A protein has these predicted regions:
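Mid-chain, structured segments of secreted extracytoplasmic proteins
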Residues: 68-126
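N-terminal secretory signal peptides that target proteins for export/translocation
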Residues: 1-3
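Sparse, context-dependent recognition of short Cys/His-centered cofactor- or disulfide-binding micro-motifs
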Residues: 6, 28-31, 40, 93, ...
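Non-cytosolic coordination micro-motifs
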Residues: 22-74, 121-287
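Bacterial N-terminal signal peptides
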Residues: 5-16
Length: 287
């Protein structure tokens, strides 16, 4: 009798559960991206094509067997539904004698926009005895990503518009990039990069993105004001000697995706809320 009462109670309880706890069907839309065709830069194989699940698999494999590595898998709910999704992945490995330190962080849109990557950063701290030559690092970067848009202030910047890397006139070869990286950014090149637009500099946008909260709402205003579709920034911070690299910081920001995914996610959230708060559709009975 007690068992029967329990079953009845559970059945009634399940029927009375609010909509937030029941399955919700999300019809995903693919957000736009700054990167297309062959122009799809990646960091450790993670690119704008990556979803939270595929990025997590890549990072799990990368850190496999490293006992002192830590991970922080951040999840959140989609609106007031019971749907959980990964919004951010953070992995770290402390630097030590003979061991390089790693900090990797990535941010993803909601399932409504495919749970896609829009920001990824890798900070690599080299052990003192393993600090590479700055010239070698510049060659490695250019060998992987091609000629940058602008070089200076210890950075190589790749600015993307309309699916391609922007050129401001200077055609960087390895030798000219190695020479320019330790100098201030060329103001003439910066002016050419901005052109006649009054929109914000993508160099400034990616720098601020590195320090602010990595959620779409916090990044949207800057993204809408940026004069590019995407940025790849590589910073090579000097190490124990000026010609050595102590820290290498890689940042990939898909500006176009921030704008597109935010619009898709906001529309989906509004639709979910409207559905949840829909007025009853019953009609008065005949009397």
């Amino acid at each position: 009798m007690v068992c029967r009462a329990l079953v009845v109670t559970l059945a009634i309880g399940a029927a009375a559960l609010p909509a937030a706890t029941q399955a919700y069907d999300i019809k995903a839309k693919t957000p736009e991206t700054a990167f297309s065709g062959k122009q799809r830069p990646d960091i450790l194989g993670i690119s704008a094509d990556s979803t939270a699940d595929s990025a997590r698999a890549t990072l799990d494999s990368f850190f496999k067997g490293r006992s002192n590595a830590t991970s922080d898998i951040q999840q959140q709910k989609f609106g007031n539904t019971a749907v959980n999704f990964i919004s951010a992945l953070n992995f770290s490995l402390p630097a030590g004698p003979g061991q390089n330190g790693e900090v990797l962080s990535s941010s993803f849109s909601s399932p409504a926009s495919g749970n896609r990557l829009y920001f990824f950063a890798r900070n690599l701290t080299f052990a003192k005895e393993q600090q590479p030559a700055k010239a070698d690092m510049v060659r490695e970067v250019m060998g992987k990503y091609g000629a940058p848009t602008i070089v200076g202030d210890q950075h190589l910047y790749y600015i993307y518009r309309a699916g391609s890397i922007v050129s401001v006139g200077t055609k960087y070869k390895e030798a000219t990039a190695i020479e320019a990286i330790g100098k201030p950014l060329d103001p003439k090149a910066a002016l050419k990069l901005n052109g006649e637009t009054i929109r914000g500099s993508c160099v400034a946008v990616v720098k601020r993105a590195q320090t602010k909260e990595k959620v779409l709402a916090a990044m949207l205003s800057e993204a809408k004001g940026a004069n590019c579709d995407g940025v790849l920034s590589v910073q090579l911070i000097p190490g124990t000697a000026p010609d050595r690299v102590g820290i290498a910081q890689f940042s990939l920001l898909d500006v176009k995706r921030v704008i597109s995914a935010a619009a898709i996610d906001n529309d989906a959230m509004a639709a979910e809320q409207s559905e949840r708060n829909a007025s009853p559709k019953g009609s008065a009975p005949k009397l």
